[in-house]
């Protein structure tokens, strides 16, 4: 029995709700999708709950689930994945945080949680932080540049804990929070103290940085604080190949996703021009996926643009992103051949552009196979048509479904 290559494409934040600017259509309905539409005659579609019905997924927990790992078992926090994706090498016991470069006033009240989002000087600021803040109370501190305004911070040393609260207030106009222990342990108390010292030191370094002085002169907001959240002890994940028997690779520019995929043992590629934003290089991502499909059984292609547009409320940009993803799918199919692979296209969660945050709605999912199946006889792929389809799955079902339809699944029982 022929075994097929597997291509899993996740458009981050793909799903949506009816949008007033689109006369009640969703971006997926409004988008022109000829390549996707052409696959429908040999596809099943439906809805996926990334975690379970009504649960609002993070991109971290949803991707763990999609890769076949129960987040209730394997999830300890996002910080470690962000750090791995940003290039950190973690050891057992390290505590990692995800964070944002942000703008605060002299009273540490947040003016902009993203320091304008675009931060071309990010690498220089990280270098300056690493040069000037190396250790606090015998705990080593290391900073890593993430995507756009994002940053990862790793604490290494004895007697530290991930049971501490965030310093990120999550809203502008509020003061940077004091980190507090989340359990009554010496390790948690000590770690919270270190984080609070770190917050002040980071502000002192960044607020006096010549880089930020130039940003102010140029009319830009200074990136003069790091807001921390998602503390996580490093816990090793099982390799993807150990439970799928697949040689796997991934294409992504987003630190979190790169971190998860690397930890799963996938070969992770970030092609030139791939940004993890709405300005990403779609052609480069398509070409990278095509090359990886030649050498791997499974290729995961992650595109962040749909989610970035949603969080900023950019309706037209989300529609354009979906149309560009459609062209990516068309280019891959044309190159690899529709008879040589199965393809799943979905999102990791719903991010409605009018809400600008994740919701617990089910996500539309499409599964194309290159051989005769009972298709769902729908005319389009969108949130409404998906409700007519045969698939009603959880994120945890995705990997098993892909193994089954690629003729790679093993029998359960005798």
Swiss-Prot record:
Keyword flag Isomerase: yes
Annotated transmembrane regions: none
Primary enzyme class: isomerase
Reaction equations catalysed: (2R)-2-phosphoglycerate = (2R)-3-phosphoglycerate
Highest taxon above the source species: Archaea
InterPro entries recorded: Alkaline_phosphatase_core_sf, ApgAM_prokaryotes, Metalloenzyme, Pglycerate_mutase_ApgM
Pathway(s) it belongs to: Carbohydrate degradation; glycolysis; pyruvate from D-glyceraldehyde 3-phosphate: step 3/5
UniProt EC number: 5.4.2.12
GO BP, one annotated term: glycolytic process
UniProt KW keywords: Glycolysis, Isomerase
Recorded GO MF terms: metal ion binding; phosphoglycerate mutase activity
Family: Belongs to the BPG-independent phosphoglycerate mutase family. A-PGAM subfamily.
Entry-linked HAMAP family: ApgM_A (MF_01402_A)
Known function: Catalyzes the interconversion of 2-phosphoglycerate and 3-phosphoglycerate.
Protein name: 2,3-bisphosphoglycerate-independent phosphoglycerate mutase
Native organism: Saccharolobus solfataricus (strain ATCC 35092 / DSM 1617 / JCM 11322 / P2) (Sulfolobus solfataricus)
Taxonomic lineage: Archaea, Thermoproteota, Thermoprotei, Sulfolobales, Sulfolobaceae
Originating gene: apgM
